[in-house]
Amino acid sequence: MGKKLDLSKLTDDEAKHIWEVVQRDFDLRRKEEERLGGLKDRIKKESSQRELLSDAAHLNETHCARCLQPYRLLVAPKRQCLDCHLFTCQDCSHAHPEEEGWLCDPCHLARVVKMGSLEWYYGHLRARFKRFGSAKVIRSLCGRLQGGGGPEPSPGEGSGDSEQTEEDGELDTVAQAQPLGSKKKRLSIHGLDFDADSDGSTQSSGHPPYLSPVPMATDSLQTLTGEPRAKDTSQEAVVLEEADVGAPGCHPHPEEQTDSLSAARQDTLTEPRFPRQSCTTALGLAVTPGPGVISSSERLSSRYPADEGTSDDEDTGADGVASQSLTWRDCAPAESQHLTGHQPTDADREEETLKRKLEEMTSHISDQGASSEEEGSKEEEAGLNRKTSIEDLPGAAPEVLVASGQTSRQETSPRGPQELMQPGRTTDQELLELEDRVAVTASEVQQVESEVSNIKSKIAALQAAGLSVRPSGKPQRRSNLPIFLPRLVGRLGQTPKDPNAEPSDEVKVMTAPYLLRRKFSNPPKSQDKAGDSFDRQSAYRGSLTQRNPNSRKGVANHSFAKPVMTQRP
Protein backbone atom coordinates (compact mmCIF):
# COMPACT_ATOMS: atom_id res chain seq x y z
CA MET A 1 0.00 0.00 0.00
CA GLY A 2 1.09 3.58 -0.62
CA LYS A 3 2.17 6.11 1.94
CA LYS A 4 -1.16 7.92 1.79
CA LEU A 5 -4.54 6.18 2.05
CA ASP A 6 -7.46 8.26 0.79
CA LEU A 7 -10.85 7.00 1.99
CA SER A 8 -12.72 10.26 1.50
CA LYS A 9 -14.72 8.84 -1.41
CA LEU A 10 -16.40 6.24 0.84
CA THR A 11 -19.89 6.80 2.12
CA ASP A 12 -20.73 6.82 5.82
CA ASP A 13 -22.16 3.30 5.75
CA GLU A 14 -19.11 1.92 3.97
CA ALA A 15 -16.77 3.66 6.39
CA LYS A 16 -18.69 2.27 9.36
CA HIS A 17 -18.60 -1.26 7.96
CA ILE A 18 -14.86 -1.06 7.37
CA TRP A 19 -14.39 0.27 10.88
CA GLU A 20 -16.21 -2.73 12.34
CA VAL A 21 -14.16 -5.18 10.28
CA VAL A 22 -10.93 -3.59 11.45
CA GLN A 23 -12.11 -3.74 15.05
CA ARG A 24 -12.81 -7.45 14.70
CA ASP A 25 -9.33 -7.86 13.33
CA PHE A 26 -7.87 -6.24 16.41
CA ASP A 27 -10.04 -8.41 18.69
CA LEU A 28 -8.78 -11.56 17.01
CA ARG A 29 -5.24 -10.37 17.38
CA ARG A 30 -5.77 -9.73 21.07
CA LYS A 31 -7.26 -13.19 21.64
CA GLU A 32 -4.42 -14.84 19.78
CA GLU A 33 -1.90 -12.97 21.86
CA GLU A 34 -3.65 -14.11 25.06
CA ARG A 35 -3.66 -17.73 23.91
CA LEU A 36 0.00 -17.62 22.99
CA GLY A 37 0.76 -16.02 26.35
CA GLY A 38 -0.94 -18.90 28.22
CA LEU A 39 0.99 -21.44 26.17
CA LYS A 40 4.21 -19.69 27.04
CA ASP A 41 3.37 -19.87 30.76
CA ARG A 42 2.73 -23.60 30.50
CA ILE A 43 6.02 -24.09 28.70
CA LYS A 44 7.85 -22.26 31.46
CA LYS A 45 6.33 -24.45 34.18
CA GLU A 46 7.12 -27.66 32.40
CA SER A 47 10.62 -26.52 31.68
CA SER A 48 11.13 -26.11 35.46
CA GLN A 49 10.00 -29.72 36.00
CA ARG A 50 12.47 -30.93 33.41
CA GLU A 51 15.23 -29.15 35.21
CA LEU A 52 14.38 -31.14 38.31
CA LEU A 53 14.24 -34.42 36.38
CA SER A 54 17.47 -33.72 34.61
CA ASP A 55 19.33 -34.28 37.91
CA ALA A 56 17.70 -37.69 38.32
CA ALA A 57 18.29 -39.32 34.93
CA HIS A 58 17.68 -42.84 36.26
CA LEU A 59 14.14 -41.77 37.29
CA ASN A 60 13.27 -40.96 33.65
CA GLU A 61 14.01 -44.54 32.65
CA THR A 62 11.22 -45.85 34.87
CA HIS A 63 8.80 -42.89 35.08
CA CYS A 64 7.35 -40.38 32.64
CA ALA A 65 9.11 -37.03 32.48
CA ARG A 66 5.87 -35.08 32.49
CA CYS A 67 3.31 -36.96 34.67
CA LEU A 68 5.90 -38.93 36.71
CA GLN A 69 3.89 -42.15 36.30
CA PRO A 70 5.64 -45.54 35.90
CA TYR A 71 5.65 -47.05 32.44
CA ARG A 72 3.44 -50.04 31.64
CA LEU A 73 4.03 -52.46 28.84
CA LEU A 74 0.58 -52.32 27.25
CA VAL A 75 -1.17 -49.32 28.85
CA ALA A 76 1.59 -46.66 28.96
CA PRO A 77 4.62 -47.66 26.91
CA LYS A 78 7.84 -45.55 26.92
CA ARG A 79 8.47 -43.19 23.97
CA GLN A 80 11.39 -40.81 23.38
CA CYS A 81 10.86 -37.17 22.33
CA LEU A 82 12.52 -35.91 19.11
CA ASP A 83 13.45 -32.50 20.53
CA CYS A 84 14.39 -32.99 24.20
CA HIS A 85 15.23 -36.74 23.90
CA LEU A 86 13.39 -37.50 27.17
CA PHE A 87 11.09 -40.48 27.68
CA THR A 88 7.37 -39.90 28.11
CA CYS A 89 4.26 -42.06 28.28
CA GLN A 90 1.66 -42.41 25.54
CA ASP A 91 -0.72 -39.89 27.15
CA CYS A 92 1.94 -37.19 27.47
CA SER A 93 3.27 -37.48 23.90
CA HIS A 94 2.01 -36.52 20.41
CA ALA A 95 2.71 -38.41 17.21
CA HIS A 96 4.67 -36.60 14.51
CA PRO A 97 4.18 -38.54 11.27
CA GLU A 98 6.28 -36.19 9.14
CA GLU A 99 9.42 -36.98 11.10
CA GLU A 100 8.21 -40.48 12.00
CA GLY A 101 8.54 -39.92 15.73
CA TRP A 102 6.98 -38.57 18.91
CA LEU A 103 7.00 -35.22 20.67
CA CYS A 104 6.33 -34.57 24.33
CA ASP A 105 3.73 -31.96 25.31
CA PRO A 106 6.19 -29.16 26.21
CA CYS A 107 8.07 -29.53 22.89
CA HIS A 108 4.82 -29.68 20.96
CA LEU A 109 3.57 -26.48 22.65
CA ALA A 110 6.86 -24.79 21.93
CA ARG A 111 6.45 -25.55 18.24
CA VAL A 112 2.86 -24.27 18.27
CA VAL A 113 3.91 -21.01 19.92
CA LYS A 114 6.73 -20.60 17.46
CA MET A 115 4.39 -21.14 14.52
CA GLY A 116 1.58 -18.96 15.91
CA SER A 117 3.48 -16.00 17.23
CA LEU A 118 5.95 -15.57 14.35
CA GLU A 119 7.99 -13.13 16.36
CA TRP A 120 10.87 -13.25 13.88
CA TYR A 121 8.50 -12.46 11.00
CA TYR A 122 6.75 -9.58 12.74
CA GLY A 123 10.06 -8.21 13.91
CA HIS A 124 11.27 -8.19 10.33
CA LEU A 125 8.11 -6.46 9.20
CA ARG A 126 8.37 -3.82 11.91
CA ALA A 127 11.95 -3.12 10.98
CA ARG A 128 11.27 -2.90 7.26
CA PHE A 129 7.62 -1.82 6.95
CA LYS A 130 6.79 0.43 9.86
CA ARG A 131 3.14 0.89 8.88
CA PHE A 132 0.58 -1.91 8.57
CA GLY A 133 -2.66 -1.90 6.64
CA SER A 134 -5.12 -1.95 9.53
CA ALA A 135 -3.30 0.82 11.39
CA LYS A 136 -3.43 3.03 8.31
CA VAL A 137 -7.15 2.40 7.85
CA ILE A 138 -7.82 3.19 11.52
CA ARG A 139 -5.74 6.34 11.29
CA SER A 140 -7.63 7.61 8.25
CA LEU A 141 -11.06 6.76 9.63
CA CYS A 142 -10.39 7.94 13.19
CA GLY A 143 -10.90 11.64 12.57
CA ARG A 144 -13.93 11.08 10.39
CA LEU A 145 -15.78 8.83 12.83
CA GLN A 146 -14.74 10.75 15.93
CA GLY A 147 -16.64 13.76 14.70
CA GLY A 148 -19.80 11.61 14.44
CA GLY A 149 -19.29 9.92 17.80
CA GLY A 150 -17.67 6.82 16.40
CA PRO A 151 -15.55 4.52 18.47
CA GLU A 152 -11.92 5.28 19.06
CA PRO A 153 -9.15 2.84 18.24
CA SER A 154 -8.47 0.47 21.04
CA PRO A 155 -5.19 0.69 22.89
CA GLY A 156 -4.33 -2.86 21.87
CA GLU A 157 -3.54 -1.79 18.36
CA GLY A 158 -0.40 -0.03 19.48
CA SER A 159 1.72 -3.17 19.51
CA GLY A 160 3.86 -1.92 16.69
CA ASP A 161 1.58 0.14 14.53
CA SER A 162 0.75 3.14 16.68
CA GLU A 163 4.39 4.08 17.13
CA GLN A 164 4.50 5.88 13.79
CA THR A 165 1.32 7.95 14.14
CA GLU A 166 3.15 11.25 14.42
CA GLU A 167 5.37 10.45 11.46
CA ASP A 168 2.33 9.41 9.43
CA GLY A 169 0.57 12.62 10.35
CA GLU A 170 3.50 14.67 9.18
CA LEU A 171 3.73 12.68 5.97
CA ASP A 172 0.00 13.08 5.40
CA THR A 173 0.19 16.84 5.80
CA VAL A 174 3.15 17.00 3.43
CA ALA A 175 1.35 14.79 0.92
CA GLN A 176 -1.75 16.98 1.14
CA ALA A 177 0.30 20.14 0.73
CA GLN A 178 2.03 18.90 -2.42
CA PRO A 179 -1.09 18.44 -4.58
CA LEU A 180 -2.46 21.78 -3.43
CA GLY A 181 0.75 23.52 -4.43
CA SER A 182 0.82 21.75 -7.76
CA LYS A 183 -2.78 22.74 -8.39
CA LYS A 184 -1.94 26.34 -7.64
CA LYS A 185 1.02 26.27 -10.01
CA ARG A 186 -1.04 24.72 -12.76
CA LEU A 187 -3.79 27.26 -12.31
CA SER A 188 -1.33 30.13 -12.51
CA ILE A 189 0.25 28.76 -15.68
CA HIS A 190 -3.11 28.14 -17.31
CA GLY A 191 -4.22 31.63 -16.40
CA LEU A 192 -1.21 33.18 -18.11
CA ASP A 193 -1.77 31.02 -21.16
CA PHE A 194 -5.41 32.06 -21.36
CA ASP A 195 -4.42 35.71 -21.01
CA ALA A 196 -1.87 35.36 -23.79
CA ASP A 197 -4.42 33.63 -26.00
CA SER A 198 -7.03 36.30 -25.36
CA ASP A 199 -4.55 39.10 -26.10
CA GLY A 200 -3.29 37.45 -29.27
CA SER A 201 -6.73 36.46 -30.55
CA THR A 202 -7.26 39.88 -32.12
CA GLN A 203 -3.85 39.76 -33.76
CA SER A 204 -4.04 36.15 -34.91
CA SER A 205 -6.20 37.09 -37.91
CA GLY A 206 -3.28 38.97 -39.44
CA HIS A 207 -0.77 36.13 -39.00
CA PRO A 208 -0.83 33.31 -41.55
CA PRO A 209 -0.10 29.80 -40.31
CA TYR A 210 3.30 29.61 -42.02
CA LEU A 211 4.90 32.58 -40.27
CA SER A 212 7.95 32.10 -38.09
CA PRO A 213 7.29 31.63 -34.35
CA VAL A 214 9.55 34.52 -33.33
CA PRO A 215 6.90 37.26 -33.25
CA MET A 216 4.47 35.00 -31.42
CA ALA A 217 7.12 34.28 -28.80
CA THR A 218 7.85 37.98 -28.39
CA ASP A 219 4.14 38.72 -28.09
CA SER A 220 3.76 36.11 -25.37
CA LEU A 221 6.79 37.48 -23.52
CA GLN A 222 5.42 40.97 -23.75
CA THR A 223 2.05 39.89 -22.42
CA LEU A 224 3.75 38.06 -19.53
CA THR A 225 6.01 40.97 -18.60
CA GLY A 226 3.33 43.56 -19.20
CA GLU A 227 5.52 45.75 -21.48
CA PRO A 228 3.71 47.69 -24.24
CA ARG A 229 4.18 46.58 -27.79
CA ALA A 230 6.23 48.68 -30.24
CA LYS A 231 4.50 50.57 -32.99
CA ASP A 232 4.41 49.39 -36.59
CA THR A 233 6.29 52.45 -37.81
CA SER A 234 9.30 51.67 -35.64
CA GLN A 235 9.28 48.09 -36.90
CA GLU A 236 9.24 49.33 -40.48
CA ALA A 237 12.21 51.57 -39.81
CA VAL A 238 14.17 48.69 -38.28
CA VAL A 239 13.27 46.49 -41.23
CA LEU A 240 14.48 49.10 -43.73
CA GLU A 241 17.76 49.52 -41.87
CA GLU A 242 18.35 45.78 -41.78
CA ALA A 243 17.48 45.54 -45.49
CA ASP A 244 20.04 48.23 -46.32
CA VAL A 245 22.68 46.41 -44.31
CA GLY A 246 21.77 43.03 -45.90
CA ALA A 247 23.90 43.46 -49.06
CA PRO A 248 25.02 40.44 -51.19
CA GLY A 249 28.08 39.93 -49.01
CA CYS A 250 26.58 40.80 -45.63
CA HIS A 251 24.17 38.63 -43.67
CA PRO A 252 22.50 39.87 -40.48
CA HIS A 253 22.04 37.78 -37.41
CA PRO A 254 19.38 35.08 -37.73
CA GLU A 255 17.23 36.57 -34.96
CA GLU A 256 17.23 40.02 -36.58
CA GLN A 257 16.55 38.48 -39.97
CA THR A 258 13.55 36.53 -38.72
CA ASP A 259 12.18 39.64 -37.03
CA SER A 260 12.54 41.69 -40.21
CA LEU A 261 10.95 39.02 -42.36
CA SER A 262 8.02 38.60 -40.00
CA ALA A 263 7.43 42.37 -39.90
CA ALA A 264 7.62 42.59 -43.69
CA ARG A 265 5.11 39.77 -44.06
CA GLN A 266 2.75 41.52 -41.68
CA ASP A 267 2.94 44.68 -43.81
CA THR A 268 2.39 42.81 -47.05
CA LEU A 269 -0.62 41.04 -45.60
CA THR A 270 -2.38 44.31 -44.76
CA GLU A 271 -1.72 45.92 -48.17
CA PRO A 272 -3.68 44.97 -51.33
CA ARG A 273 -1.09 44.91 -54.13
CA PHE A 274 -1.35 44.25 -57.85
CA PRO A 275 1.26 42.62 -60.11
CA ARG A 276 1.25 45.35 -62.78
CA GLN A 277 1.72 48.09 -60.27
CA SER A 278 4.58 46.21 -58.58
CA CYS A 279 6.31 45.59 -61.91
CA THR A 280 6.05 49.20 -63.00
CA THR A 281 7.28 50.56 -59.73
CA ALA A 282 10.15 48.09 -59.72
CA LEU A 283 11.60 49.80 -62.82
CA GLY A 284 12.67 52.77 -60.79
CA LEU A 285 14.51 50.80 -58.16
CA ALA A 286 18.01 49.30 -58.26
CA VAL A 287 17.51 45.58 -57.87
CA THR A 288 20.27 43.63 -56.12
CA PRO A 289 20.43 39.80 -55.82
CA GLY A 290 19.78 38.09 -52.50
CA PRO A 291 18.28 40.04 -49.63
CA GLY A 292 18.14 43.22 -51.72
CA VAL A 293 15.01 42.04 -53.46
CA ILE A 294 13.27 41.65 -50.16
CA SER A 295 14.40 45.12 -49.08
CA SER A 296 12.99 46.74 -52.22
CA SER A 297 9.66 44.98 -51.74
CA GLU A 298 9.59 46.16 -48.14
CA ARG A 299 10.22 49.74 -49.26
CA LEU A 300 7.39 49.51 -51.75
CA SER A 301 5.10 48.13 -49.10
CA SER A 302 6.08 50.93 -46.72
CA ARG A 303 5.35 53.66 -49.30
CA TYR A 304 1.75 52.62 -49.84
CA PRO A 305 -0.26 52.72 -46.59
CA ALA A 306 -2.59 49.88 -45.70
CA ASP A 307 -6.30 50.15 -46.32
CA GLU A 308 -7.89 48.79 -43.20
CA GLY A 309 -11.39 48.31 -44.49
CA THR A 310 -13.66 45.33 -44.60
CA SER A 311 -12.53 41.80 -43.83
CA ASP A 312 -13.11 40.75 -47.46
CA ASP A 313 -10.34 43.02 -48.71
CA GLU A 314 -7.96 41.62 -46.12
CA ASP A 315 -8.76 38.05 -47.11
CA THR A 316 -8.22 38.72 -50.81
CA GLY A 317 -4.93 40.47 -50.08
CA ALA A 318 -3.75 37.59 -47.89
CA ASP A 319 -4.69 35.02 -50.54
CA GLY A 320 -2.90 36.80 -53.41
CA VAL A 321 0.31 37.71 -51.62
CA ALA A 322 2.29 34.66 -52.73
CA SER A 323 1.38 34.91 -56.43
CA GLN A 324 1.88 38.70 -56.54
CA SER A 325 5.28 38.51 -54.87
CA LEU A 326 6.38 35.79 -57.29
CA THR A 327 5.31 37.76 -60.38
CA TRP A 328 6.99 40.91 -59.08
CA ARG A 329 10.22 39.02 -58.43
CA ASP A 330 10.07 37.56 -61.95
CA CYS A 331 9.43 40.92 -63.62
CA ALA A 332 11.87 43.10 -61.72
CA PRO A 333 15.13 41.16 -62.34
CA ALA A 334 14.36 40.74 -66.05
CA GLU A 335 13.70 44.45 -66.60
CA SER A 336 16.75 45.44 -64.60
CA GLN A 337 18.82 43.07 -66.71
CA HIS A 338 17.52 44.71 -69.91
CA LEU A 339 18.36 48.13 -68.51
CA THR A 340 21.91 47.19 -67.54
CA GLY A 341 22.58 44.99 -70.60
CA HIS A 342 22.80 47.85 -73.17
CA GLN A 343 25.78 49.43 -71.39
CA PRO A 344 28.89 47.21 -71.77
CA THR A 345 31.20 47.32 -68.80
CA ASP A 346 34.56 45.83 -67.88
CA ALA A 347 32.86 42.82 -66.35
CA ASP A 348 31.07 42.11 -69.64
CA ARG A 349 34.32 42.27 -71.56
CA GLU A 350 36.04 39.91 -69.15
CA GLU A 351 33.08 37.63 -69.46
CA GLU A 352 33.36 37.56 -73.28
CA THR A 353 37.08 36.81 -73.15
CA LEU A 354 36.51 33.96 -70.71
CA LYS A 355 33.80 32.57 -72.97
CA ARG A 356 36.12 32.59 -75.97
CA LYS A 357 38.88 30.85 -74.04
CA LEU A 358 36.54 28.15 -72.81
CA GLU A 359 35.13 27.62 -76.31
CA GLU A 360 38.65 27.21 -77.68
CA MET A 361 39.41 24.66 -74.94
CA THR A 362 36.26 22.67 -75.72
CA SER A 363 36.99 22.70 -79.47
CA HIS A 364 40.54 21.53 -78.79
CA ILE A 365 39.24 18.67 -76.64
CA SER A 366 36.71 17.73 -79.34
CA ASP A 367 39.50 17.67 -81.96
CA GLN A 368 41.51 15.36 -79.72
CA GLY A 369 38.47 13.10 -79.33
CA ALA A 370 37.94 12.97 -83.12
CA SER A 371 41.60 12.13 -83.76
CA SER A 372 41.53 9.36 -81.14
CA GLU A 373 38.37 7.98 -82.76
CA GLU A 374 40.06 7.98 -86.20
CA GLU A 375 43.03 6.13 -84.76
CA GLY A 376 40.66 3.58 -83.22
CA SER A 377 38.88 3.05 -86.56
CA LYS A 378 42.22 2.56 -88.36
CA GLU A 379 43.29 -0.01 -85.80
CA GLU A 380 39.96 -1.78 -86.21
CA GLU A 381 40.44 -2.01 -90.00
CA ALA A 382 43.95 -3.38 -89.55
CA GLY A 383 42.70 -5.98 -87.09
CA LEU A 384 39.87 -6.95 -89.43
CA ASN A 385 42.36 -7.49 -92.28
CA ARG A 386 44.46 -9.73 -90.04
CA LYS A 387 41.78 -12.08 -88.75
CA THR A 388 39.04 -14.28 -90.22
CA SER A 389 36.02 -13.65 -87.97
CA ILE A 390 35.26 -11.83 -84.71
CA GLU A 391 31.89 -11.00 -83.28
CA ASP A 392 32.84 -8.34 -80.77
CA LEU A 393 34.28 -5.79 -83.19
CA PRO A 394 31.12 -5.10 -85.25
CA GLY A 395 29.30 -4.35 -81.98
CA ALA A 396 32.13 -2.24 -80.54
CA ALA A 397 32.62 -0.02 -83.60
CA PRO A 398 29.05 1.36 -83.55
CA GLU A 399 29.45 2.14 -79.85
CA VAL A 400 32.55 4.20 -80.60
CA LEU A 401 30.77 5.95 -83.44
CA VAL A 402 27.74 6.65 -81.27
CA ALA A 403 29.91 8.10 -78.51
CA SER A 404 31.77 10.27 -81.02
CA GLY A 405 28.49 11.41 -82.49
CA GLN A 406 27.22 12.37 -79.07
CA THR A 407 30.35 14.39 -78.35
CA SER A 408 30.25 16.14 -81.71
CA ARG A 409 26.56 16.94 -81.30
CA GLN A 410 27.05 18.31 -77.84
CA GLU A 411 30.04 20.36 -78.91
CA THR A 412 28.61 21.69 -82.19
CA SER A 413 25.08 22.29 -80.87
CA PRO A 414 24.48 26.05 -80.55
CA ARG A 415 23.15 27.62 -77.43
CA GLY A 416 19.43 27.74 -76.95
CA PRO A 417 17.37 30.90 -77.41
CA GLN A 418 17.00 31.25 -73.65
CA GLU A 419 20.76 31.47 -73.18
CA LEU A 420 21.13 34.02 -76.03
CA MET A 421 18.25 36.14 -74.75
CA GLN A 422 19.77 36.51 -71.28
CA PRO A 423 22.69 38.98 -71.55
CA GLY A 424 22.49 39.93 -67.88
CA ARG A 425 23.59 36.56 -66.50
CA THR A 426 26.50 36.71 -64.13
CA THR A 427 29.95 35.52 -65.08
CA ASP A 428 29.98 32.96 -62.30
CA GLN A 429 26.94 31.12 -63.66
CA GLU A 430 28.29 30.94 -67.21
CA LEU A 431 31.70 29.87 -65.97
CA LEU A 432 30.08 27.05 -64.03
CA GLU A 433 28.10 25.94 -67.10
CA LEU A 434 31.19 25.99 -69.30
CA GLU A 435 33.17 24.07 -66.71
CA ASP A 436 30.43 21.45 -66.66
CA ARG A 437 30.60 21.15 -70.44
CA VAL A 438 34.37 20.77 -70.34
CA ALA A 439 34.05 18.05 -67.72
CA VAL A 440 31.43 16.22 -69.82
CA THR A 441 33.56 16.32 -72.96
CA ALA A 442 36.64 15.19 -71.04
CA SER A 443 34.73 12.22 -69.62
CA GLU A 444 33.48 11.29 -73.10
CA VAL A 445 37.01 11.46 -74.52
CA GLN A 446 38.22 9.27 -71.68
CA GLN A 447 35.42 6.80 -72.43
CA VAL A 448 36.44 6.65 -76.12
CA GLU A 449 40.07 6.08 -75.15
CA SER A 450 39.05 3.26 -72.81
CA GLU A 451 37.02 1.64 -75.61
CA VAL A 452 40.00 1.88 -77.99
CA SER A 453 42.28 0.28 -75.39
CA ASN A 454 39.69 -2.46 -74.89
CA ILE A 455 39.69 -3.15 -78.65
CA LYS A 456 43.49 -3.30 -78.63
CA SER A 457 43.49 -5.78 -75.77
CA LYS A 458 40.97 -7.97 -77.61
CA ILE A 459 43.09 -7.91 -80.79
CA ALA A 460 46.20 -8.86 -78.80
CA ALA A 461 44.35 -11.73 -77.15
CA LEU A 462 43.16 -13.05 -80.51
CA GLN A 463 46.66 -12.79 -81.94
CA ALA A 464 48.03 -14.73 -79.00
CA ALA A 465 45.43 -17.43 -79.63
CA GLY A 466 46.55 -17.74 -83.27
CA LEU A 467 43.25 -16.70 -84.87
CA SER A 468 42.96 -14.58 -88.00
CA VAL A 469 40.18 -12.10 -88.81
CA ARG A 470 38.55 -11.52 -92.20
CA PRO A 471 37.14 -8.09 -93.14
CA SER A 472 33.50 -7.53 -92.27
CA GLY A 473 32.61 -5.84 -95.59
CA LYS A 474 30.32 -8.66 -96.73
CA PRO A 475 29.27 -11.11 -94.05
CA GLN A 476 29.44 -14.65 -95.43
CA ARG A 477 27.91 -17.77 -94.03
CA ARG A 478 30.39 -20.37 -92.95
CA SER A 479 29.67 -24.08 -92.85
CA ASN A 480 30.50 -26.01 -89.73
CA LEU A 481 31.49 -29.10 -91.71
CA PRO A 482 35.25 -29.25 -92.37
CA ILE A 483 34.63 -30.93 -95.77
CA PHE A 484 33.89 -27.50 -97.33
CA LEU A 485 37.23 -26.00 -96.31
CA PRO A 486 38.76 -25.98 -99.85
CA ARG A 487 35.88 -23.80 -101.12
CA LEU A 488 36.32 -21.37 -98.26
CA VAL A 489 40.02 -21.10 -99.05
CA GLY A 490 39.29 -19.94 -102.55
CA ARG A 491 36.70 -17.44 -101.42
CA LEU A 492 38.68 -16.01 -98.57
CA GLY A 493 41.77 -15.61 -100.69
CA GLN A 494 39.96 -13.55 -103.36
CA THR A 495 38.21 -10.71 -101.60
CA PRO A 496 36.95 -7.59 -103.45
CA LYS A 497 39.57 -5.53 -101.64
CA ASP A 498 42.41 -7.84 -102.69
CA PRO A 499 41.57 -9.42 -106.11
CA ASN A 500 45.12 -10.53 -106.95
CA ALA A 501 45.72 -12.62 -103.92
CA GLU A 502 48.67 -14.94 -103.90
CA PRO A 503 48.39 -18.62 -102.95
CA SER A 504 50.89 -18.12 -100.16
CA ASP A 505 48.45 -15.72 -98.49
CA GLU A 506 45.69 -18.30 -98.74
CA VAL A 507 47.91 -20.90 -97.15
CA LYS A 508 48.77 -18.51 -94.32
CA VAL A 509 45.13 -17.75 -93.74
CA MET A 510 44.12 -21.35 -93.28
CA THR A 511 47.16 -22.85 -91.57
CA ALA A 512 46.28 -21.53 -88.14
CA PRO A 513 42.73 -23.02 -87.92
CA TYR A 514 44.03 -26.31 -89.24
CA LEU A 515 46.79 -26.50 -86.67
CA LEU A 516 44.37 -25.66 -83.85
CA ARG A 517 41.86 -28.25 -84.94
CA ARG A 518 44.58 -30.84 -85.29
CA LYS A 519 46.09 -29.91 -81.95
CA PHE A 520 42.84 -30.34 -80.02
CA SER A 521 41.48 -33.35 -81.90
CA ASN A 522 44.48 -35.69 -82.27
CA PRO A 523 45.53 -38.01 -79.43
CA PRO A 524 48.83 -37.27 -77.70
CA LYS A 525 50.66 -40.08 -79.56
CA SER A 526 49.69 -38.88 -83.03
CA GLN A 527 50.87 -35.30 -82.46
CA ASP A 528 54.45 -36.25 -83.30
CA LYS A 529 53.52 -37.42 -86.79
CA ALA A 530 52.06 -34.61 -88.85
CA GLY A 531 51.08 -36.67 -91.90
CA ASP A 532 49.51 -39.66 -90.14
CA SER A 533 45.76 -40.08 -90.47
CA PHE A 534 43.46 -41.93 -88.14
CA ASP A 535 43.10 -45.65 -88.94
CA ARG A 536 39.45 -46.67 -88.74
CA GLN A 537 40.35 -50.38 -89.07
CA SER A 538 42.54 -50.45 -85.99
CA ALA A 539 42.70 -53.58 -83.87
CA TYR A 540 42.00 -51.83 -80.56
CA ARG A 541 38.79 -49.87 -80.48
CA GLY A 542 37.88 -50.17 -76.78
CA SER A 543 34.71 -51.38 -75.14
CA LEU A 544 31.36 -49.64 -75.15
CA THR A 545 31.58 -48.79 -71.46
CA GLN A 546 35.06 -47.34 -71.74
CA ARG A 547 35.10 -43.66 -72.59
CA ASN A 548 37.16 -42.55 -75.54
CA PRO A 549 39.48 -39.64 -74.64
CA ASN A 550 38.50 -38.07 -77.96
CA SER A 551 34.85 -37.17 -78.46
CA ARG A 552 32.77 -38.56 -81.30
CA LYS A 553 32.89 -35.21 -82.97
CA GLY A 554 36.67 -35.32 -82.93
CA VAL A 555 36.63 -38.80 -84.52
CA ALA A 556 34.41 -37.50 -87.31
CA ASN A 557 36.87 -34.68 -87.94
CA HIS A 558 39.71 -37.21 -88.18
CA SER A 559 37.82 -39.40 -90.61
CA PHE A 560 36.76 -36.67 -93.04
CA ALA A 561 39.21 -33.77 -92.59
CA LYS A 562 42.47 -33.74 -94.50
CA PRO A 563 45.35 -31.28 -94.52
CA VAL A 564 44.72 -28.26 -96.72
CA MET A 565 48.13 -28.48 -98.36
CA THR A 566 47.41 -31.93 -99.80
CA GLN A 567 44.09 -30.74 -101.29
CA ARG A 568 45.67 -27.93 -103.31
CA PRO A 569 46.31 -28.60 -107.07
Swiss-Prot record:
Residues 431-465 form a coiled coil. InterPro entries: FYVE_2, Intracell_Transport_Effector, Melanophilin_FYVE-rel_dom, Myrip/Melanophilin, Rab_BD, Znf_FYVE_PHD, Znf_RING/FYVE/PHD. One of its GO terms (cellular component) is cortical actin cytoskeleton. GO terms for molecular function: actin binding; myosin binding; small GTPase binding; zinc ion binding. Residues 143-430, 490-569 are annotated as: Disordered. Residues 352-362, 379-390, 526-535 have a biased composition (Basic and acidic residues). One of its GO terms (biological process) is intracellular protein transport. It is found in: Melanosome. Keywords: Coiled coil, Metal-binding, Repeat, Zinc, Zinc-finger. Disulfide bonds: none annotated. CDD domains: FYVE_SlaC2-a. Its main location: other. Residues 404-415 have a biased composition (Polar residues). A zinc finger (FYVE-type) spans 58-112. Residues 4-124 form the RabBD domain. Rab effector protein involved in melanosome transport. Serves as link between melanosome-bound RAB27A and the motor protein MYO5A. Binds RAB27A that has been activated by GTP-binding via its N-terminus. Binds MYO5A via its C-terminal coiled coil domain. This is Melanophilin.
